[in-house]
A protein has these predicted regions:
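Intrinsically disordered, low-complexity segments enriched in serine/proline and basic residues
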Residues: 4-10, 14-17
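Active-site-proximal beta-strand elements of phosphoester/diester hydrolases
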Residues: 142, 163-166, 220, 280
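Internal active-site segments that recognize and position negatively charged phosphoryl groups
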Residues: 156-185
């Protein structure tokens, strides 16, 4: 399987040594991709022969000792029959996640290249079925119906009571508006909100949102499961766009600049006070392929 910008395969013996995994039990062929800087390891598991442990996932995603990624995805058949395919998704800390917007675009592009699929395709996630369509080098994924909207909640933080809004766009997100995203305390405040009792038991992702203009925002995200800032978060920018529509009168499509510099686009409709037909559009780029002993 050949992809654009393919690099030399990683030496499996070397990688086994780096990971401390000893003798290779299996050679994992992978593809590295990114969606607006949010990067992922993808692999073909249609025969379901690959079963990675949490420790192996953490090693693979480690940026100094492994391949490096925000998450890892395996392509598997869809047992429910609700979609063409299904995914196995894990964050870089080994935890599973219901949904990932940037990951979904990369996953769709990966399926297209791997299978030769033409036209739209669907795959099942823990959040529901995702439909993807392609337009040149950009991918649009239709997201599941948002739920759990909460607005204007005063949450007690170390910096004092802070107004936070929240919405689940496949995974939970908290929204904090800031005057200047460059000055947002993403690491400190992000970690505090992520683990705050207000969002127990599983915590939340945290997005710092700066309004840049009409229907245009900038977003920085502290991601649960990565436990730090990422260059982009698709479900996060979607939550930020929808809450900006509700609170700031934004109309679709909403343009969102992420920390990596890319522009994403969120489209939607509002019916009877609810958001429907929510979709996220952005890049999904191949970086390289390789193989590693696991």
């Amino acid at each position: 399987m050949q992809f654009p910008n393919q690099a030399a395969a990683i030496n499996p013996g070397l990688m086994a040594s780096v990971f401390g995994l000893g003798c290779a039990a299996m050679l994992l062929e992978f593809t590295k991709m990114n969606g607006a800087g949010n990067d992922f390891i993808l692999f073909d598991n249609r025969d379901r022969k690959i079963s990675l442990t949490t420790a192996q996932i953490v090693h693979l995603c480690h940026r100094q000792r492994g391949i490096g990624a925000d998450g890892i995805m395996g392509l598997v058949p869809c047992d429910s029959g609700k979609a063409d395919w299904s995914w196995q998704f894990h964050n870089s800390d080994g935890s599973s996640a219901e949904m990932c917007g940037n990951g979904a675009r990369c996953f769709a592009r990966y399926i297209q290249k791997l299978t030769g699929a033409t036209g739209d395709l669907t795959f099942e996630t823990a959040a529901g079925v995702i439909r993807a369509r392609f337009n040149g080098d950009r991918v649009t994924v239709g997201l599941t119906k948002p739920h759990g909207l909460r607005l204007n909640e005063a949450v007690a933080l170390q910096q004092g009571p802070t107004e936070i809004h929240s919405l689940n766009t496949g995974v939970p997100h908290a929204i904090v508006y800031v005057d200047d995203a460059d000055k947002a305390m993403v690491a400190g405040v992000g970690a505090e909100v992520r683990h705050h009792a207000h969002f127990k038991p599983r915590g939340t992702n945290v997005n710092f949102v700066q309004v840049k203009g009409p229907d245009f925002i900038r977003v920085r995200t502290y991601e649960r499961g990565v436990e730090g800032e990422t260059l982009a978060c698709g479900t996060g920018v979607t939550a930020a766009a929808l809450i900006s529509a509700r609170l700031r009168g934004f109309t679709p499509p909403v343009k969102v600049q992420v920390q990596g510099g890319d522009l994403l686009e969120v489209s939607f409709r509002e019916e009877n006070g609810e958001f429907t037909d929510v979709a996220l559009t952005g890049p999904a780029d191949f970086a390289f392929t390789g193989s590693v002993s696991v």
